[in-house]
């Protein structure tokens, strides 16, 4: 009888429970070693992404600041005269960004009016009334 059991056992193929447990333990050990490495790569990728986003924001803010505080240049189309000040045709005029309007008369080349408005101030000059200003800042 024992001989028969031994023969039956030799004919059966497969893994024993102990062999399966050993394989599972080896896989778990490998996974435990790999997980920290993978997490480091994920952290590095997130840091690189954050740095890239910050650089993009910096460039955008710099462009907006340059836009907001830059000066606009205009070439005088004709000779402009007003209150003893003459600007000859072709002269480059520099105006603060945000200037709303500057008008002149085509017939005689005189400057008729100028107005400027920013967040807290409104300034206007006209030939008839001269300078006027309003401070719109809340105090």
Describe each model-derived feature in a short phrase.
Residues 81-82, 86-88, 113-118:
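Mixed-charge, low-complexity intrinsically disordered regions
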Residues 40-58:
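Aliphatic-rich helix starts adjacent to a transmembrane/signal segment
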Residues 74, 78-82, 89, 95-99:
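N-terminal amphipathic/basic membrane-interacting segments and domains
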Residues 12-38:
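N-terminal single-pass transmembrane signal-anchor helix
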Residues 1-15:
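N-terminal leader/signal peptides at the extreme start of proteins
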Residues 99-139:
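Short, surface-exposed interaction loops/tails
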Residues 59-79:
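Alpha-helix exit/C-cap motif
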């Amino acid at each position: 009888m024992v001989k028969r059991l031994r023969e039956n056992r030799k004919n059966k193929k497969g893994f024993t429970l102990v062999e399966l447990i050993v394989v599972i333990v080896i896989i778990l050990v490998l996974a435990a070693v790999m997980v920290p490495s993978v997490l480091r790569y994920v952290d590095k990728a997130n840091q690189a992404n954050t740095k890239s986003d910050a650089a993009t924001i910096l460039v955008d803010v710099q462009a907006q600041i340059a836009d907001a505080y830059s000066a606009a240049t205009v070439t005088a189309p004709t000779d402009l005269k007003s209150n003893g000040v003459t600007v000859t045709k072709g002269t480059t005029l520099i105006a603060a960004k945000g200037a709303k309007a500057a008008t002149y008369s085509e017939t005689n080349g005189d400057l008729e009016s100028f107005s400027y408005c920013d967040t807290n101030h409104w300034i206007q000059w006209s030939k008839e009334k001269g300078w006027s200003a309003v401070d719109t800042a809340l105090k």
